[in-house]
């Protein structure tokens, strides 16, 4: 009899079991979206680093060999130069980018600002004022390809790109040799900049070549002078910092993807003891501004 009573004391009623299951379900419903979102964010961060390590390094090697300006257009560059450095499974001309998993439908992708937009197919669709560049052809078209890891890439190329100039103000767009917009999962959702869509930008046709793929915050930090711009980023989000002048130039060149249509922004790069480097998102101008001047601030995570 005692044994039977012991068993009955530890038994659960159906109501208790259902209540427990219900509580577990509620907790799971609260926690799972956060866990899934954090997992996705890590995947997007890994994709950005992979794109930078593969595309950026491949173009850098071409540059070091002195061949970065030898191609005639984006198609020639991909087919006859990039293919020697990067495993490419498929290529597509500008009229058939969707065959390479690049969504080109009208308003089918989301900018970083979460506004509907159309994937750029010509250089002039990348940023405001890009035609101000002296050696940048705004009508130049992109070329598409699929990497061996499944990433879809929409690549822009400038055979006339110029070396860096740290002694004078200049047009930033003229320093971009290659700009590659990637989509880690092709036509699949979410097709959103900052998530499955990002970009790798390669600057300068010489040994000073730089490849960057900034992870850009969705909104501006508070405007500030050069001295306080970094702190403005930290106040917005401690994981973010002020971009250097090359990262900031890449952001301008892809400003339509980011939803940044105007403004003058500080970089973290000094021009002199009194001057810092800034970037105009209105016309592409790279300028040296007084460190005491107040400009816009947009932050990045590395």
Predicted regions mapped to residue ranges:
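N-terminal secretory signal peptides that target proteins for export/translocation
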Residues: 1-7
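C-terminal, surface-exposed recognition/capping segments
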Residues: 239, 245-302
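Bulky hydrophobic/aromatic "packing anchor" residues in well-ordered structure
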Residues: 212, 229, 266-267
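Membrane-proximal N-terminal amphipathic helix
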Residues: 41-82
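Intrinsically disordered, low-complexity regions enriched in Pro/Ser/Thr/Gly and acidic residues
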Residues: 76-211
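Short, surface-exposed beta-strand/loop "edge" segments at domain boundaries and coil↔beta transitions
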Residues: 153, 186-197, 221-227, 247-250, ...
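A short alpha-helix/helix-coil micro-patch that ends at or immediately precedes a cysteine
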Residues: 221-240
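N-terminal single-pass transmembrane signal-anchor helix
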Residues: 8-40
């Amino acid at each position: 009899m005692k044994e039977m009573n012991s068993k009955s004391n530890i038994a659960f009623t159906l109501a208790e079991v259902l209540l427990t299951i219900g509580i577990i379900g509620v907790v799971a419903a609260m926690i799972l979206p956060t866990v899934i979102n954090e997992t996705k964010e890590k995947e997007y961060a890994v994709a950005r680093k992979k794109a930078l390590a593969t595309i950026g390094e491949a173009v850098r090697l071409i540059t070091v060999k002195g061949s970065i300006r030898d191609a005639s257009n984006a198609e020639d560059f991909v087919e006859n130069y990039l293919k020697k450095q990067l495993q490419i499974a498929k290529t597509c001309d500008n009229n058939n980018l969707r065959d390479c998993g690049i969504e080109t439908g009208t308003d089918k992708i989301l900018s970083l600002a979460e506004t509907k937009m159309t994937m750029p197919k010509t250089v002039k669709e990348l940023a405001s004022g890009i035609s101000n560049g002296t050696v940048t052809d705004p009508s130049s078209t992109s070329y598409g390809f699929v990497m061996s890891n499944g990433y879809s890439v929409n690549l822009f190329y400038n055979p006339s790109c110029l070396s860096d100039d740290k002694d004078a103000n200049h047009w930033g767009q003229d320093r971009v040799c290659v700009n590659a917009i990637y989509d880690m999962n092709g036509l699949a959702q979410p097709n959103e900049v900052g998530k499955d869509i990002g970009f790798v930008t390669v600057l300068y046709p010489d040994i000073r070549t730089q490849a960057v793929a900034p992870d850009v915050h969705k909104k501006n930090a508070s405007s500030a002078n050069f001295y306080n711009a970094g702190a403005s980023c930290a106040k917005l989000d401690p994981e973010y910092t002020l971009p250097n002048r090359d990262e900031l130039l890449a952001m301008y060149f892809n400003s339509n993807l980011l939803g940044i249509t105007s403004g003058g922004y500080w970089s973290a790069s000094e021009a002199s003891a009194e001057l810092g480097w800034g970037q105009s998102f209105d016309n592409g101008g790279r300028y040296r501004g007084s460190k005491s001047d107040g400009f816009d601030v947009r932050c990045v995570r590395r």
